[in-house]
Every structure is written in structure tokens, then in C-alpha cells.
Amino acid sequence: MRILVTNDDGLTSMGIVTLANELAKEHEVHVVAPETQLSSIGAARTYNRPIRIWRWNGGLYNGPVDVYATDGTPSDAVFMGINMFKPEIVVSGVNLGENVGLESLFISGTIGAVIQSSLIGVPGIAASIEVPPHSKFIIPQINGDYFSGIVKVIKGIINHIEAEGWVKGVDALSLNMPSPSRWSGGYVVVSRMAKRLFKETVIESSDPRGNKIYWRWGEELMPLDTDTDAYAFYREGKLTVTPLILGDSSTGLSDIVRSIEELISKVIRA
């Protein structure tokens, strides 16, 4: 398959490097991704200035992978990449840090990228993995083996899609995998996302010149509703698979969940 790969952590993140290199062993892979870290930018687009894109030769990626950097957002990267390469599917990730709960749909650049592709008509997979809390908004030095579990799942889904077609009634899939030490192979197809996971507050401080500065930060809310993606992820250590449906679907939700469960079951057992 012809695959477009992007992310919001920047094209030097080991998550996207590992994913692209692995996919390129079996598929035609093009990477178009932000040059720098752009976490929590959602599906933002650039309209107030030109978007620059250039071939990137900074190493890290294996020879077959075609790599471009952009000064735009993940959504811009997908828009440009679809116009340039006409991919059959877009894969966004692997994001450093999970994207669990309803807020992630509006905040995550990883998910924003596949929302953009879906609006154009190209299905997408957004993939995220749990990392230590202090690493969520930086690029930690994580070995490529850390991503082996979720990369295996992504490759399995793509191989299934290549053989049997995309999941009927679904625009995109969002995958969230616990850290390797917490994941034992369990999974859940999500029909309800947790509404709010953190109680945010304003943290006030000062810069070296004495000017006031502010941070948004918060602690995890407790307890978690047991029928949500957050509970399955944080409390049960399960891979969560969330179907994203933009608008009405002629396929019933129960049928969608059943078909995804069958797909993921085959992938996990493989």
C-alpha cells in the first residue's frame, strides 16, 4: 500500500522513525511531518502565511522511506502529503504519550492529522503509546524496541485493510497502547470516551525579569467511570481502539464494534 506517515512530535521522534522504517519493509512509505514538536495543536491549519515543505536528509530513516519536513501543523502535513503522494491510508504516530478521553479529540495533533485525512476522504490510523509522565511533551530518548507492540498492531491492521478493505462505517481509528511493562495483550474497542481526565489549574510564576508567567497543568481526576476508554487503559492496562466517525454512518455502532473486535483479535493473535 501507499502510506503517508506523520505525527505531532516532529520527524526526529523515535516513534515516527521506528514506525516508518518498519512499514517501509512491506509498503511504499512517504513521511511528511512537522520539523519541530507541535503537541496539543489539534487539527489546526495554517492560513496566515505560506507553508514550507522540503526534503529531509537528516539520517534516522532507512533508504526506502521518502521524508519531507514542514513548518506547518500535522494537519498541514497531511493536506500537503495527500496532494503530493495520493496515499491509500494515513498513519499518524507513534505519539509519545497516550491520547485517551474526549478532550484528546480536540487537542491532539496526532488525532487531528487523521481527522484532516478523513475529511479529505483518506482513512487514517492515529497511534499513541504511554510514556513516563515527565516525557509527554518532550522527545525522550526511547529505544525503537519500545514501540514494537504497537507497530505490530498497526502493521497487522494495514495488512488486513490491504486484503479486505477499510472498516465499514468508520473514518479513522485511534489506538492507545499502555507502556510495554503494563500491556499484557488485552484490548477493548471503545464506544464511550471519558469526558474529562484532569482537573486543570493555573500555575503562576515569574520570568527572570520579574514578569508574570502562567502554566496550565492539572492532576488526574478520580475515580474513572468503568465503561470508558480511560478505565480500560489506566486501570486494566488494555490497548484501546476507538473508531472515529465524522457525521452519520449507515452502519450501526454495534456492527462497527464487532467488526473492529474481529480485526484486532486476529492482529493480536498473529
UniProtKB/Swiss-Prot annotation:
Gene3D superfamilies linked = Survival protein SurE-like phosphatase/nucleotidase
Binding positions for a divalent metal cation per the UniProt entry: D8, D9, S39, N95
Q: Which reaction does it catalyse?
A: a ribonucleoside 5'-phosphate + H2O = a ribonucleoside + phosphate
Q: Which branch of life, at top level?
A: Archaea
Q: What is its main location?
A: cytoplasm
| One Pfam family here | SurE
Going by the UniProt record, its keywords in alphabetical order are: Cytoplasm, Hydrolase, Metal-binding, Nucleotide-binding
Which enzyme class?
A: hydrolase
* GO CC entries: cytoplasm
Q: Would the keyword Membrane be found if you checked this record's keyword annotation?
A: no
Q: Where in the cell is it found?
A: Cytoplasm
Molecular function (GO) terms for this protein are:
5'-nucleotidase activity; metal ion binding; nucleotide binding
- Reported function: Nucleotidase that shows phosphatase activity on nucleoside 5'-monophosphates.
- HAMAP family per record: SurE
What family does this chain come from, according to its entry? Belongs to the SurE nucleotidase family.
Could you identify this protein by its name? 5'-nucleotidase SurE
What is the native source organism of this protein?
Caldivirga maquilingensis (strain ATCC 700844 / DSM 13496 / JCM 10307 / IC-167)
